[in-house]
Swiss-Prot record:
EC number: 4.2.1.-
Primary enzyme class: lyase
Family listed: Belongs to the D-glutamate cyclase family.
Gene Ontology MF: a single term: lyase activity
Signal peptide: none
Keywords, comma-separated and alphabetical: Lyase
Superkingdom classification of source: Bacteria
Gene3D superfamilies, alphabetized: PSTPO5379-like, PSTPO5379-like domain
Protein name: Putative hydro-lyase PA14_37210
Keyword match Lyase: yes
HAMAP family in alphabetical order: Hydro_lyase
Length: 265
């Protein structure tokens, strides 16, 4: 049986897509998948870090809009889907150990610990369908790429051992489209809301749009403005500085696709 095309994958209901991912039959990015459904960034921490991280999310709701938190040791997000298992239902994960480069894997069952607490954080991929419905084209989708993401000079509000830079995702749009995109995305605070910045990237500490820190480069046309949304990769940048002994995250752009619609929250 031939592998499904990306267009075919985009039509799959989230439970079917997750089954495909769980079996190891898809390991690519999730931008453009699960149309109209919430996608979530993932952070998994040992319980000794969980309270600090929960407070960090509360202090930084633009970058870390919290969708759900698991019970200690549980790999399930009951609010997001009855059969979700965070150990296997994302296409790609990063396992981070103190002092080592992160390792990317497609399943984290072998790394799971009894005191792990999982956090689901809203993702801007969720509102992309609303932009498309309004006739606003998205360059990264047209090119079949992941979105471009950058570390910025915008500091997060600290919580205990957790502090560091805000990460943003970038989408280039013409001026009229940019105005409409701001209006549309401001309605969805649980998926990062309106952009944090638009225009000159240097003003927020980004040196070169052609060299994103995460994801893929997305070209900017002469008549376009870059718009920057707060991004759920922010916790990875912050945790990289805090250096827990062990934590697990999604690989940037490889999200959990939930059963909840993006406009339900």
């Amino acid at each position: 049986m031939p592998e499904p095309t990306f267009h075919e994958l985009a039509q799959l209901p989230p439970p079917v897509l997750r089954q495909l991912i769980r079996r190891g039959d898809y390991a690519g990015h999730t931008s453009g998948l699960g149309q109209r459904h919430l996608q979530a960034n993932l952070v998994i921490l040992q319980k000794s870090w969980a309270d600090e991280f929960l407070r960090f999310c509360a202090l930084n709701p633009r970058a870390c809009p919290l969708l759900d938190v698991s019970e200690p040791g549980s790999p399930h997000f009951a609010r997001l889907g009855a059969d979700i298992d965070v150990r296997s239902d994302l296409p790609r994960y990063r396992v981070h150990r103190r002092g080592q480069e992160p390792v990317e894997v497609n399943d984290i069952g072998a790394f799971w610990e009894a005191d792990f607490v999982a956090f689901a954080i809203g993702c801007s991929f969720s509102f992309e369908q609303a932009l498309l419905d309004a006739g606003i084209g998205l360059r990264h989708l047209e090119l079949g790429r992941n979105v471009a993401m950058y570390r910025t000079a915008i500091a997060t509000r600290p919580s205990g051992r957790l502090a560091g830079p805000t990460v943003v995702s970038m989408r280039p749009l013409k001026a009229a489209e940019a105005i409409r995109a701001i209006q549309i995305t401001s309605r969805f605070p649980m998926t990062h809301g309106a952009p944090l910045h638009l225009g000159d990237p240097a003003l927020i500490g980004i040196r070169d749009l052609a060299r994103p820190d995460y994801g893929d480069p997305v070209p900017l046309a002469a008549d376009e403005i870059p718009l920057f949304w707060a991004c759920g990769v922010t916790p990875q940048a912050v945790l990289a500085e805090a250096q827990p002994e062990l934590y697990i995250s999604h690989a940037p752009g490889h999200m959990l696709v939930s059963d909840r619609l993006y406009d339900e929250l």
